């Protein structure tokens, strides 16, 4: 009996030690990247990076994230917390070519499972920077970005997001489990938004194609133009602000709710034709109203 008890104790100790040694695994999304070393060999702590950076990839477990542009010529990585950050829990970062990887670090043991320190990450890019890619994976915390990137990907489990960008974006892919999304952009070639619970509000000068899927929450959009789009809402309303000369064909399937429009249209069954009907928009609303509003011109 004593031998079994001793073995169990040593087993628990080994488990806790193992948990510590595995507390900093490389993100699953990064494991297949050639040449990316084990995170234990990365640099740690706040940093000033003088080298050119074309892509930023962030994996953050607990705390808010800000990605902004500054006035200097260097890239700054800073984390802060209401509590003192132990040396072994400082963020990890690695520069592979011109791609910067930043990872939340938390040394956990069996006896401290689930206790992650809430840390605020701020990444400040050089003035007038334009990234090829910005990728953010956040488990819990709000995200704020005000930078230029050709490709923007966000995967957030719990937290709101505010996204501001004026320069053209090729692809923007936002996947949120719980949290509101606020987006202001210029031209976007391809926009994909998947939200399980939360409100979505976006405005853009123009969108090539858009695919918006919201399980529970309202969607508000303001557009100058678009080529094609699909909007699927299980429970929530849809409001679109469009120019008075909007030119699109909309197929609407609304199970429980009504459709109202300030812009004239021709109706053919479940199809609504605005102008000559050039662009295509399919909407599917299970429970909620659809409102098409006229976008006010500047000066009105």
Segments and roles (model prediction):
Residues 2-88, 107-131, 143-145, 262-278, ...:
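Short acidic/polar N-terminal linker immediately downstream of export determinants
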Residues 75, 98-100, 259, 290:
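Hydrophobic residues embedded in beta-strands of well-ordered beta-sheets
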Residues 133-185, 192:
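Right-handed parallel beta-helix
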């Amino acid at each position: 009996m004593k031998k079994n008890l001793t073995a169990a104790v040593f087993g628990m100790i080994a488990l806790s030690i193992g948990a510590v040694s595995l507390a900093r695994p490389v993100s699953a999304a990064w494991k297949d990247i050639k040449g990316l070393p084990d995170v234990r060999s990365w640099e740690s702590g706040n940093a000033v990076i003088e080298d050119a950076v074309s892509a930023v990839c962030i994996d953050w477990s607990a705390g808010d994230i800000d990605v902004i542009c500054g006035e200097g010529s260097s890239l700054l990585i800073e984390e802060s917390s209401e509590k003192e950050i132990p040396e072994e829990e400082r963020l990890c970062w690695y520069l592979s070519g011109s791609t910067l990887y930043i990872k939340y670090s938390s040394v956990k043991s069996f006896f401290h499972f689930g206790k992650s320190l809430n840390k605020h990450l701020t990444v400040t890019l050089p003035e007038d920077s334009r990234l090829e890619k910005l990728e953010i994976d956040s488990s819990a915390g709000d995200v704020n970005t005000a930078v230029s990137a050709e490709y923007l990907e966000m995967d957030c489990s719990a937290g709101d997001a505010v996204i501001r960008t004026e320069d053209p974006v090729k692809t923007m892919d936002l996947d949120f489990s719980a949290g509101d999304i606020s987006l202001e952009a210029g031209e976007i070639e391809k926009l994909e938004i998947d939200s399980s619970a939360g409100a979505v509000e976006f405005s853009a000068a123009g969108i090539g194609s858009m695919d918006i899927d919201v399980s529970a929450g309202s969607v508000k959009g303001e557009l100058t133009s678009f080529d094609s789009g699909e909007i699927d809402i299980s429970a929530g309303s849809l409001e679109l602000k469009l120019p008075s000369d909007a030119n699109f064909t909309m197929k609407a399937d609304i199970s429980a709710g009504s459709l109202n429009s300030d812009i004239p249209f021709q109706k053919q069954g479940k199809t609504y034709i605005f102008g000559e009907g050039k662009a295509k928009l399919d909407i599917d609303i299970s429970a909620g109203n659809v409102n098409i509003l006229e976008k006010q011109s500047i000066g009105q």
